[in-house]
Amino acid sequence: AGVIGCGGRGSGAAFNFLNAANGVTIVALGDTFQERVDELAGKLKKDKNIDIPADKRFVGLDAYKQVIDSGVDVVIIATPPVFRPVHFQYATEKGKHSFLEKPICVDPVGYRTIMATAKQAEAKNLRVITGTQRHHQRPYVESYKKIMEGMIGEITGGTVYWNQSMLWFRERQKEWNDCEYMIKDWVNWKWLSGDHIVEQHVHNIDVFTWFSGLKPVKAVGFGSRQRRITGDQYDNFSIDFTMENGIHMHSMCRQIDGCVSNVSEFIQGTKGSWDSSTMEIKDLAGNVVWKYDYEAEKANFKQTDPYTLEHVNWINSIRGNKPLQQASETAISNMAAIMGRESAYSGAETTWDAMTASPLDYTPKDLNLGKMDMSTFTVPVPGKPRDQNK
């Protein structure tokens, strides 16, 4: 495997991959910054006795091409998500199986690239998996089965949450240029992360679209920036999604210290409800009719970590020549989050048809690792014209 993006998530995914199966190794690393590549190379040597020679350590905004062209079989792509569509596109062109960390796009242009590339990957018999680890987490998989069996009846709505304390940030150092600073602080900049509703909360939105089999047709929401320190993003969102059949999903996410936390999903049905915070299904009277058995999982399965299990399933699909292509499904959840974000930013109702056809592109023109016009990166204000919310 080659690893593209050697920060925290890329490093984590690299070790998840190595722990997922025998006979796998990492042979090439790429990142925008030399220190990131060298840090991961050092960890691989220390913990796994894997040597990454200097000629397999690639640096710069085009390092992804060098990793993909270095003779690898598969790629782990974990760069800031604005780059995901282009990196996936190149990997697919070169015939590589891909692990794409979520989110896999931050805007409609990226969404369309992902959807088109996913079709190409299928045509080439490539295995593509995304970092939506709940799809491989047994409590979620078993809950999905119970809901598909009709245990809660017909789904009538739900609420999904990712409310937590403030995420990490980087203060600018005087030796960093504009682009270098933003990439090192990427989770706080709209163009790089897509804002936290896309970058993080997509996990919870994805659970509802997965369990219901529905995509949203419109979104109305709001959000604000209360205590964020760097970047140009919001730190809270609340979105009402109307799904294809008319039911509603309420989505809320927050990254503010000192507030109540909740990372879970709740789905209501005509016969009962499911709550991921307890992994229980209750009937309409509030009686628990099913509960996931964590002790049985520990007793029956050697591996329970979902971050490793997603790599187990990816490797098994490649070795067993079994179809696996999650990019298009994840892209739909991603687009739902984008719809919610754009409604909050603008104060307008967004629709699936309009957003999927939108020319909105967050990637700066003529991007290079140097000076950028920082005045263009402003916090969105609802009710202002779209061209003032870039």
Regions found by a protein language model. Give the residues of each.
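N-terminal Rossmann-like dinucleotide-binding module
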Residues: 1-48, 208
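Glycine-centered tight beta-turn/hairpin loop motif at sheet-sheet or coil-to-beta transitions
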Residues: 244-248, 271
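C-terminal helical cap and adjacent loop that interface with cofactors, partners, or active-site loops
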Residues: 11-13, 199, 203-216, 220, ...
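Predominantly a Rossmann-like dinucleotide-binding segment in NAD(P)-dependent oxidoreductases
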Residues: 5-9, 124-130, 134-231, 239-241, ...
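Rossmann-like NAD(P)-binding element
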Residues: 66-86, 99, 106
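A structured beta-alpha segment of the ubiquitous adenosine-cofactor-binding alpha/beta core
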Residues: 47-77
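Beta-strand-loop-alpha-helix segment that lines the small-molecule cofactor/substrate pocket
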Residues: 85-136, 150
